[in-house]
Amino acid sequence: MTWKALLKDDPTPWLLEPVLSTVEGSDLANPGVRYFALRDLLDRPEDDPEVRQARAAIMTTGPIPAILEAQYPDGYWVKPGSGYSPKYRGTVWQIILLAELGANPSDERVRRGCEYLLNHSIAANGAFSAYQRPVPSGSIHCLNGNLLSALLRLGYADDPRVQAAQDWQARAITGEGIQYLKSGTSGPGFACSANQGQPCAWGANKAMKALIAVPPDQRTPVMQRAIEVGAEFLLSRDPAVADYPYTERVSSTWFKFGFPLSYWSDVLETTAVLVELGYGGDGSTEPSGRASGRGLAEVPRLANAFQFILSKQDAQGRWKLENTLNGKMWADIEKKGKPSKWVTLRALRVLKRVEQVRSAQDASSR
């Protein structure tokens, strides 16, 4: 059974619609979806003419032109400094958004923004800081993970500053050679002062996304240990219930799929992280290659998450935008409560990855 068989209908043609309108809020003004659908769902190479055309449209249509129009000549947005504030118009958030929307890493404006961030947002411990004057007490997993994921997408994998932040991220998770503070990341295993010193699953998802974006053969031993710690933590609860340690009750944000997520997370993101690690194609919580290959619905901890994701599709195989930052960014992205190309893309990536995990396990068991 292919991943499309799990859908009530095939939304791929909808995702592949060409950019026909630039009307604010129009789902047709999000050319990044077409680019990513061609690349990630149809497996088209980067030099494919349609892929190249779709990627070029990203820089001229939709949210990215509005973001770049607001950039100051020195490379920052709104005001000089580390760029965390104001949410969600400061420098930090634009770099994250540019990467998520598919900005061209070679664009001079994008490079200028990345360089400004790297030169003004890193604390003495090597991590990114949320404070206007970057100090170690402002280093938190959600921020560091989001920015590392963005910078890797934007071509900075070999930059020593990025590699230092990766090392901090991994060591802050495992507790190796890290001096924790009362503010910010306050202990190993994703402990965060914003969560009353408890492990933060939102931060865990962001940190894990950043670490698993590093190719396996390029991960350091401490990165691999951190990934194992993160997987164990995320699998310690049912992602569909999301009753991870929290300040009060479980946040309803977990159950509302959105784009972009910023520092928030949802069930779909947790599932995406675990499936990317190879969990989900077998009958246990062991990653790909260690078990029998029976199917995601039988996997403890992931079965409910998978069914929850599928239950949210409509009759056309689309997912709604339930969580949004519209009105707070330089440009709105789709409309809340309406079918979302971005959220649908997120869901389909997970479904396709599950099929890849299953296929790999079937091949290894032969």
PLM region spans:
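Preference for long, amphipathic alpha-helical scaffolds in soluble/luminal domains
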Residues: M1-R366
